[in-house]
Amino acid sequence: WATRDVTLVRRADLGESAIGAKAADRATSDELAVLYTDSVLFGLGTGGWISVLTEAESAAGVILPALVLGAGSAGVVAAIDHTRPFRYGVPQSIVTGMLLGFEEGMLWTYWNQARVRWDEEWEPKTMTSVIWGFTAAGALTGGIVGTAGGTTPGRASFVGSTSLWSAAVTGLLTTAATDLDDNSADDTILLASIIGLNAGAVGGMLGAGSVSPTIARVRYLDLGGISGGILFGGLYVAAQGDSTDGRSAVAITATGMVAGLGTAWLLTSGMPKDHRVEKTTAAPVSWAPT
């Protein structure tokens, strides 16, 4: 056992540990809780989208569809998990895909609004349809990729984190380097954020397998990025006072995010990895008389 780094633990002592879920290739309770929460939010958003399409004018016309679809979305998740339990990492993969799709939809929508004349802008029905479509497609893609290719909660969350931070840093640095008096400044910044979002997603998918972080490590990385941005940006504004330059502030904030992410990466480098359990087949046993 020492050679194989194996230990014996009573099942009762595992509690909410992911060990049992990983061994059985079943989603953890934490994953499912996050998926239920996001499915309700998706249902509420779908209700809002429908109210825009139908041009609902009463409070009931707006609220009731959202409530029904919010509860219905959670019911669909429960039905799927009851019929065919989600595999380990799949719920988080769905959530990551949903968030990526939402971010894509928002950025593309506002980029389009920024690049065209006011009379060519999309109507609310088109805007909400694009955002809803990207969100739904992202959730579906995340579920398919997670189920077919196999993943872990940490890997799936890592992809969402790399894409978000890449978009944020790219957008802020572009803001700092762009002449904000230029009429095309806003669409340039939004397009840069879109490129950063997709580059981060691709980079995250390529690196997730080798990094294979636990979801706890991903949260620490996010904390590092948030803390670094607040620290650097806050200190700059505090030091400059009334003479604060907006472009310098966003550049320093972006630098702080990168520094915070890098620091968190180094500090968490010793955390254990979250590898999938590879199923093995038992070796054949033969018996011979002696």
Question: Model-derived features: where do they sit?
Answer:
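Short, highly charged
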Residues: 44, 48-56
